[in-house]
């Protein structure tokens, strides 16, 4: 039901060998989709399910559960059908409903209410995940090419929050650098060093264990090159502790990367000039305009000049110009020429269209 490629991404050796030199970000393509349970197919049950789907999608778009506590959310929920694109039952499961929303309309609502908005480009993390069986004490490491109930629960939780993890492939290079004891013991430096080959900005390590019939404990840390956080969650089921872990991780990342849309409400958007080279025809120009306006940080993009194969745009931003630069590079559609950290270049950013 939850497409693995959009959630916990399993990376092959070839991808690692030829990976890009810059920090990886995932493009999350299903932010406007939600799966919800539907026990009966009467009209009232469907309306309730669609409202639940709306809440799930709004949390994904914002990155924070605070969005559904906003004073205007109830009014949005009461008019939910204005934002629904389609609904369909999941193949082979008549109790699961897939609801797809108009993402652009929902993002406009988020901006109008000055709530955080998290774009589709989201930082990836290499996830070392180990679980210990309560009875046998046997330990399992989640890795490339394998599937089990724990991974399914993780996939579902990640889909519901719009985040992505990369699992280690555990080839000879991985097992030489990182052992089962390292993961179980959560040896921070060893795991962070072992994750560097995956070129992700974050390393996450999870240790999951069942303490008794109705007691589960999940210990985890999140580390970047400059930050470290350690946490522990407990609950009565595996489903609950995995859900809490993903919720906490997502809320953490959203506070760092989601856009503050107050500029939209105050009509104080920042304007930035950018030029894009290698625009060879009208088709490429149309693709560029569509791409720029699809970015959450961009309120609108106006073509100012076309000179030869170089297009100059005035872009109205909801965030800082440096944020736009990083989003553009993460999207892998352009090659940067300008260094935005150079004060002499801050007025005009320059790129090549791929």
Which residues does each predicted region cover?
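Bacterial N-terminal signal peptides that target proteins for export
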Residues: 2-11
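N-terminal signal peptide c-region/cleavage motif recognized by signal peptidases
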Residues: 20-23
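C-terminal soluble interaction/assembly domains
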Residues: 249, 270-354
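A short, hydrophobic beta-strand-centered structural micro-motif
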Residues: 79-89, 166-169, 182-219, 328-346
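Short, well-ordered alpha-helical segments
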Residues: 31-76, 241-253, 283-294
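Amphipathic beta-strand/beta-sheet edge segments enriched in Tyr/Trp
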Residues: 30-39, 198-244, 325, 348-353
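Signal peptide-directed extracytoplasmic domains
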Residues: 70-131, 136, 140-145, 149
